[in-house]
A protein has these predicted regions:
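Asp/Glu-rich intrinsically disordered low-complexity tracts
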Residues: 4-5, 12-13
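PAPS-dependent sulfotransferase catalytic domain
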Residues: 11, 57-109, 115-219, 271, ...
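A short, charged/proline- and glycine-enriched loop
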Residues: 17-23, 102-103
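N-terminal pre-catalytic "stem/leader" segment of glycosyltransferase-like enzymes
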Residues: 22-66
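General alpha-helical segment detector with a strong preference for membrane-spanning helices
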Residues: 34-36, 116, 253
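The conserved 3'-phosphoadenosine-5'-phosphosulfate
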Residues: 54-62, 179-243, 247, 262, ...
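Anionic, Ser/Thr-rich low-complexity intrinsically disordered regions
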Residues: 233, 238, 243, 252, ...
Length: 370
């Protein structure tokens, strides 16, 4: 760690905790989750941790719930347990626990559902003919029943109440108060921290406390953010119509925003403010040290390249600087880098175990489900 990036944090006693090395992050769609993911990928790479990854791309499941059989054999560590899960999936609690370290922290992030939906509508091209074939304003004008009748797009991955869907729930449960309450209870038990995108710095202070990490570990550049010119302005009436359609996500968001506020209130205010201000200052330091200019992500090369021109990327001053290059890396490029490194690491260990006559180093995968 850099020597000037501040003490670790645990409540108001900054020297008493031990850094944690395992975390499950349920990466929700269009909720600033790529920003958090970059933090976790940096930490995992720096400490040679093992990631849950698919054979290609940045998904391990979805729209079907996560299953351990989705992980290719060559990714598995010998222990059969992973340190970091930071890529898109659809939550299945029991299956996830089977592959994660027993001491893993559980974290996710939510966003104002109207803002999330507006972003997803544009980013995933809901408006094109092979999807919903209408503009966002035309969609807003539809009766609620017509909105609800539209199918999910992208092979079932994307649609309304996306956060509830990513968390493993059928949005139709919103009509059953008992099931809604059970959902909230189950998620409260499963997750140590539910971050809120509109409170990113505050959420990261709590993540830092949870993981006992340094300020540099949780500093960030915003990832996958669209240009302001692409956003659709919404009136109060537009928002009200979308809130009705996104009812289950609204319930989730309000519940966990309140829970986050309670977690913030549990930290001494002077400690919390000091760590928030330190995080902001550290981010500004790296912006000045690393970034030459912002650009369309699709115009950038190598591991900084984004797959769409809708989002911002960063031209760097010095691409050889480890911290700068990682802060600026696009999700796909960074994921490929981690996958290649883990493939090589697992191959070396299997070769070593094979020399020692230890079953060729075969990974110990969880037993098949009955």
């Amino acid at each position: 760690m850099a020597g000037d990036d501040g003490p670790k944090m645990a409540g108001d006693d900054s020297d008493s905790c031990v850094p944690r090395d395992s975390i499950f992050f349920l990466k929700t769609h269009k909720c600033a989750s790529s920003t958090v993911q970059n933090i976790l990928m940096r930490y995992g790479e720096k400490h040679s941790l093992n990631f849950v990854l698919g054979s290609t791309g940045n998904y391990v499941g979805s729209p079907t719930p996560f299953n351990s059989r989705l992980i290719p054999d060559w990714i598995w560590p010998r222990s059969g347990k992973f340190d970091v899960f930071a890529h898109h999936t659809r939550l299945h609690v029991a299956e996830t626990r089977r592959v994660m370290q027993d001491h893993a922290a559980w974290v996710t992030i939510l966003r104002d559902p109207v803002a999330q939906f507006e972003s997803a509508f544009d980013y995933y091209h809901f408006s094109i003919a092979q999807h919903w074939n209408m503009t966002l304003r035309q969609f807003i004008a539809l009766p609620l029943e017509r909105k609800q009748a539209l199918g999910r797009i992208g092979y079932g991955r994307f649609g309304g109440n996306q956060m509830a869907f990513d968390l493993g729930y059928d949005p139709a449960i919103v009509s059953e108060p008992r099931l809604v309450q059970a959902m909230l209870d189950d998620l409260d038990k499963a997750f140590d921290l539910v971050m809120i995108a509109e409170m990113m710095d505050e959420s990261l202070v709590l993540l830092r406390q949870l993981m006992c990490w340094s300020i540099d570990d949780v500093t960030y550049f915003t990832k996958n953010a669209r240009f302001d010119s692409l956003r659709t302005p919404l009136s109060g009436a537009d928002r009200a119509a979308l809130e009705k359609f996104l009812e289950l996500d609204m319930i989730l968001y309000r519940h966990f925003r309140q829970r986050l506020a309670q977690q913030i209130a549990a930290v001494p205010i002077a400690t919390f403010l000091a760590h928030t201000e330190a995080l902001v200052a550290r981010r500004l330091h790296y912006r000045q040290h690393c970034v030459a200019s912002e650009a369309k992500g699709s115009e950038l090369q190598g591991q900084q390249h984004e797959i769409t021109d809708k989002v911002k990327g960063y031209r760097l001053i010095d691409y050889s600087d480890w911290m700068c290059s990682r802060l600026g890396m696009a999700e796909i490029g960074y994921t490929d880098l981690l996958r290649d490194g883990q493939r090589q690491r697992m191959a070396i260990w299997r070769w070593v175990y094979g020399l020692l006559g230890m079953d060729g180093g075969a990974p110990q995968q969880p037993e098949e489900r009955t």
